[in-house]
Amino acid sequence: MTERPRDCRPVVRRARTSDVPAIKQLVDTYAGKILLEKNLVTLYEAVQEFWVAEHPDLYGKVVGCGALHVLWSDLGEIRTVAVDPAMTGHGIGHAIVDRLLQVARDLQLQRVFVLTFETEFFARHGFTEIEGTPVTAEVFDEMCRSYDIGVAEFLDLSYVKPNILGNSRMLLVL
């Protein structure tokens, strides 16, 4: 008798508050290298933006995460994509980004931005490198009112320059 191969694709679902400690652990794995450190309160405040991946063979263990943050009426940002290092190469990051892009489409966003070191990864999803900040002067001025550090990074404000050195700015038109 031949055993059917198991479907080992990750299950990607909305994050719950109970997932925040696992998200924090994933982020901490990459903090200071390719992701900014995030404290627990910041993650709890943004939990509604996060999606997590569970691997079916690991009894619901969170093995990846990512968030979609709306920046403006037509523009979102994918941020904080992280995969358990033991699980890289299994399509988990791609599954998360695919889900986040679907959410962006559902929200009727027209463009999605990412600030990343992982240019090849995001290029496989159709992102292209850009220069500057792809918003009008009026929108730029309004966005400067945000307290979100990620928005400041998107705007390339001088006080966040140390956070973004070496990152590439990429954009996908949906």
Swiss-Prot record:
The keyword Transferase applies. Keywords: Acyltransferase, Amino-acid biosynthesis, Arginine biosynthesis, Transferase. It catalyses: L-glutamate + acetyl-CoA = N-acetyl-L-glutamate + CoA + H(+). Pathway: Amino-acid biosynthesis; L-arginine biosynthesis; N(2)-acetyl-L-ornithine from L-glutamate: step 1/4. Its EC number is 2.3.1.1. One of its GO terms (cellular component) is cytoplasm. GO terms for biological process: arginine biosynthetic process via ornithine; L-arginine biosynthetic process; protein homotetramerization. Residues 10-148 form the N-acetyltransferase domain. One of its GO terms (molecular function) is protein homodimerization activity. Inhibited by L-arginine. InterPro entries: Acyl_CoA_acyltransferase, GNAT_dom, NSI-like. It is an enzyme of class 2 (transferase). Homodimer and homotetramer. Catalyzes the conversion of L-glutamate to alpha-N-acetyl-L-glutamate. L-glutamine is a significantly better substrate compared to L-glutamate. Was identified as a high-confidence drug target. Belongs to the acetyltransferase family. This is Amino-acid acetyltransferase. It comes from Mycobacterium tuberculosis (strain ATCC 25618 / H37Rv). The lineage of its organism: Bacteria, Bacillati, Actinomycetota, Actinomycetes, Mycobacteriales. The gene is argA.
